[in-house]
Amino acid sequence: MLNFKLLKTDGNARRGQLTLNHGVIETPIFMPVGTYGSVKAMSPLELNEIDAQIILGNTFHLWLRPGNDIIAKFGGLHEFMGWNKPILTDSGGFQVFSLGEMRKITEEGVHFSSPINGDKLFLSPEVSMQIQRVLNSDIVMQFDECTPYEIDGRPATTEEAAKSMRMSLRWAKRSMDEFNREENPNALFGIVQGGMFENLRDESLAGLEELNFHGVAIGGLSVGEPKEDMMRVLEHVGPRLPANKPHYLMGVGTPEDLVAGVASGIDMFDCVMPTRNARNGWLFTRFGDIKIKNARYKDDKKPLDESCSCYACRNFSRAYLHHLHRTGEILGARLNTIHNLHYYLDLMREMREAISEGRFQLFVSQFHADRARGS
C-alpha cells in the first residue's frame, strides 16, 4: 500500500505525507541506514526517541546473513529486528556491483562469489523481488545496475552509461513483473540511471514512467563524481520527476546535500554518513562540523551544539565526548551516533516547517550562514 499526498510546495521544495503499510511518513525525510537489520550503535527504542520515521535495510547483506529462511520464520524483517515502523530495502544491486572482480554481469543477472565464504551465488531482478517479499519491507527497490562514475580509471563514456542504463530499464520491467507475480502488498520504486548524462537520465525516467512505479529514485550519484557533476544531474532530474509520486535520492549525503536535494524536489534520503562519521568522531552541528578527537575540545565544557535537544547535547560536554573517543569507549560511539542522527532528522523537520510556512529560501540562506559560522 502506498498513498502519497503533496501538501505544499515552495519553489521545487515539497512537503508531503507518505502512507505505507507500517505507518505514515512526513516528507522530506532522512532514513537511517540499518545494513544488517540494525542501525549501528542504536536500539529501536533510541531510534523512536529521535523520531526516526523509516529506516533502510540492505537486501544483499540480509540475504547472506542471517538468510531469507531465518527471516521468513519471523514473518519479515520488522518482527525479526523489533521495529514496527516502515522499512525501505535496497535491491542488492549496488553491493553486488561493488564486488568488482568477484562478479560477472549478464542480461539475466549477476553471478558472484559470496564475500563471506566464497559460495557461488546469483542475483537477478526476480531473485531480488523474492528476497524483498520475504523481508516484507514497506518500500521495495527495483534491481538495477548502478552505473559507475569511473571505468578502468576514467569517466564512463556515453555509450557505457547508455548500455548500463538500458539494461537497468529492462531489469525494471522484470522487477515490476515479479513484484506483481509475488502479489507483494507493499510499494515498488524504480531507479533513474544514466550516469552524468542528462539525455540518458531523461531516457531512463521516460522508461520508468511507462512502467508506473509507486515512486521514483535517483541512483548513481555520490559514486565518486565531482560535486559539481552531482549537483548538475540532481538539479536536472529532480524537478522532472513525476509530481504525484515520492522522489528518493539514494546514498546522499552531507547536510548541504540534503538541503540541495530538497531544493531540487527530493522527498527521501539515506546515507551512512551520520552513523559512520559518528563512530569516527566527526560530528555535525548547526554551526559546522566538529572533529571531537582534536585537542582543543579536551577541556571544553560546552555541549556539542547548544541549539540541539538530543540526549548527548542535553547531558554531556565536548570534553567528555573527547575523552570517550580518545579512550575508545563504546559509549562515545553511541552518543555521537544519537547526536548525528538527531541532527539530520531535526534538519529535515526544520525544512518541512519552512516549506509549510513558505519560507524555504530564507531557511536555506540561514542554514548556509550558520554552517559557515563555525562551532
Swiss-Prot record:
PANTHER family: QUEUINE TRNA-RIBOSYLTRANSFERASE. GO terms for biological process: queuosine biosynthetic process; tRNA wobble guanine modification; tRNA-guanine transglycosylation. The keyword Zinc applies. This is Queuine tRNA-ribosyltransferase. Its EC number is 2.4.2.29. Belongs to the queuine tRNA-ribosyltransferase family. Zn(2+) binds at C308, C310, C313, H339. Coiled coil: none annotated. Residues 251-257, 275-279 are annotated as: RNA binding. GO terms for cellular component: cytosol. The keyword Metal-binding applies. GO terms for molecular function: metal ion binding; tRNA-guanosine(34) queuine transglycosylase activity. Keywords: Glycosyltransferase, Metal-binding, Queuosine biosynthesis, Transferase, tRNA processing, Zinc.
